[in-house]
């Protein structure tokens, strides 16, 4: 029904109402038809990416698979690029991530994103093919760093939403953003991201946007937690599963992720907001 509505109305009335599709954009129900394209962008929830990839036709796969997912797979502990390489080894994997909301992209608002591909030549080609007058892409070969920035900022955004929802103030949010950024750097480095990986659109850029806008689903989810309100279970909140996956990986790496830990505890109703504040504020004093 959703697909038929999109074909008739030439817009996604459920997600992006009143924003018409470009004339060149076709709408197909056949996954094999979509997979026949040279470049395929995968804009599906992170926790559904593995299942979606298993449904892709194995014969004549796309030459390029570009993940637009932001998160860590809870079942495997892998990022999007690792899932792509495991399930579609004949395709060149890339990650498109950074500070953007779908409404801004659809409206043609000026936007800049990170395009990460381990193959530098493939990244150069994709950059040329996917750039538009309103979308500027910066390429990188640090795929791990790019996808971890996009994943972990969702966790920090939940914490910031809790802070504002609970009425703890903008100063508390700023502290969480700054210390959350350090947490992102520490975790990314432990998993092989390059130095300064978070000093990017996919790291600091996406963190800034997501932690300060109520357009962010993760921020809104945290805001509801802070107000002790129920959140619509039909709305995708990538940061919840990512926080759990990151915490499991951090335990293996013996990496301290205090903000991520309280986000997991809050999302599982194991602690109240006041307890979360006490846990973070009573940590041993340290040098910055």
Regions found by a protein language model. Give the residues of each.
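NAD(P)-dependent Rossmann-like dehydrogenase/reductase catalytic/cofactor-binding core
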Residues: 160-161, 189-199, 203-288
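Phosphate-coordinating loops and pocket residues in cytosolic domains that bind phosphorylated ligands
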Residues: 8, 36, 278, 282
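Electropositive phosphate-/nucleotide-binding environments in soluble metabolic enzymes
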Residues: 28-31, 43-46, 50, 59, ...
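Internal alpha-helical scaffold of NAD(P)-dependent oxidoreductase catalytic cores
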Residues: 83-93, 110-197
């Amino acid at each position: 029904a959703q697909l038929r509505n999109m074909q008739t109305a030439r817009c996604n009335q459920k997600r992006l109402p009143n924003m018409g599709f470009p004339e060149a954009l076709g709408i197909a129900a056949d996954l094999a038809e979509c997979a026949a394209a040279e470049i395929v962008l995968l804009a599906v929830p992170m926790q559904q990416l593995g299942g979606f990839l298993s449904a892709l036709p194995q014969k004549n796969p796309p030459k390029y698979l570009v993940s637009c997912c932001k998160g860590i797979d809870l079942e495997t502990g892998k990022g999007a690029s690792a899932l792509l390489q495991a399930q579609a080894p004949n395709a060149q994997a890339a990650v498109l991530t950074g500070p953007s909301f779908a409404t801004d992209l659809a409206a043609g608002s000026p936007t800049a994103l990170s395009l990460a591909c381990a193959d530098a030549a493939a990244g150069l080609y994709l950059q040329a093919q996917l750039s538009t007058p309103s979308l500027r892409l910066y390429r990188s070969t640090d795929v791990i760093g790019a996808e971890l920035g996009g994943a972990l900022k969702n966790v920090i955004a939940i914490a910031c939403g809790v802070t504002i929802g609970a009425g703890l103030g903008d100063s508390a949010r700023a502290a969480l953003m700054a210390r959350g950024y350090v947490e992102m750097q520490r975790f990314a480095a432990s998993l092989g991201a390059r130095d300064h990986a978070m000093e990017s659109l996919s790291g600091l850029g996406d963190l800034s946007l997501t932690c300060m806008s109520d357009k962010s689903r993760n921020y809104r989810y945290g805001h509801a937690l802070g107000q002790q309100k129920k959140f619509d279970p039909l709305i995708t909140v990538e940061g919840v599963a990512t926080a759990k996956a990151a915490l499991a990986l951090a335990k293996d790496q013996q990496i301290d992720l205090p903000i991520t830990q309280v986000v997991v505890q809050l999302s599982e109703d194991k602690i109240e907001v006041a307890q979360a504040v006490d846990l973070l504020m009573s940590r041993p004093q340290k040098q910055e």
